[in-house]
């Protein structure tokens, strides 16, 4: 497992980071639509929903880029998992309350005609992405990342770092 773990971590970084970059980029051009998408969940005061509609795309881009380059993998993995859990809570409450909205996960969002809302697919996707974030939090040392892999210990409590 030790030889495959860094490769699995690389795949997890690229999938999770690439997804976050795509989501952030697609919202970045139309932040007003991102705000509409967040408001459609009817969870937060309008001013906070508008704020998150602007901040989340920047956050997704930043965390996604850090994951792809392999910088701060443990913390960005944890932040990604928390973000996905937040998305899952928002989507679940919209579904439970019978709201008819598009999740706005990759741009767009807001109200949709009755019967056109799809909650299961985004929930399954976000669950998988959250699991990738948890994996990276637990196993942050991956191939081709900027984070340093710790040197193997030579004796109890010593390392090769000098």
Model-derived features: positions:
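A generic alpha-helix propensity feature with a strong bias for hydrophobic helices
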Residues: 48, 60, 153-155
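Short hydrophobic/aromatic-rich motifs at helix boundaries and adjacent loops
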Residues: 6-10, 35-38, 61-62
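Extended, low-polarity transmembrane helix blocks
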Residues: 1-29, 69-162
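Hydrophobic alpha-helical transmembrane segments
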Residues: 51-69
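Solvent-exposed, well-ordered loop and adjacent helix/strand elements within mature globular domains
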Residues: 23-56
């Amino acid at each position: 497992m030790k030889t495959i773990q860094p490769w699995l971590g690389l795949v997890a970084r690229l999938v999770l980071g690439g997804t976050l970059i795509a989501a952030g980029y697609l919202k970045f051009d139309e932040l007003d639509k991102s705000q509409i998408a967040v408001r459609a969940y009817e969870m937060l005061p309008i001013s906070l929903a508008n704020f998150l509609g602007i901040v989340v795309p920047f956050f997704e881009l930043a965390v996604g880029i850090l994951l792809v380059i392999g910088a701060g993998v443990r913390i960005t993995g944890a932040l990604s998992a928390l973000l996905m859990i937040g998305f899952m809570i928002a989507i679940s409450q919209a579904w439970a309350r019978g709201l008819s909205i598009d999740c706005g996960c990759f741009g767009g969002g807001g109200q949709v005609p009755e019967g056109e809302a799809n909650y299961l697919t985004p929930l399954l996707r976000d669950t998988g992405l959250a699991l990738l974030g948890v994996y990276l939090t637990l196993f942050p040392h991956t191939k081709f990342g900027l984070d340093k892999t710790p040197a193997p210990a030579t004796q109890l409590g010593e390392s090769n770092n000098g």
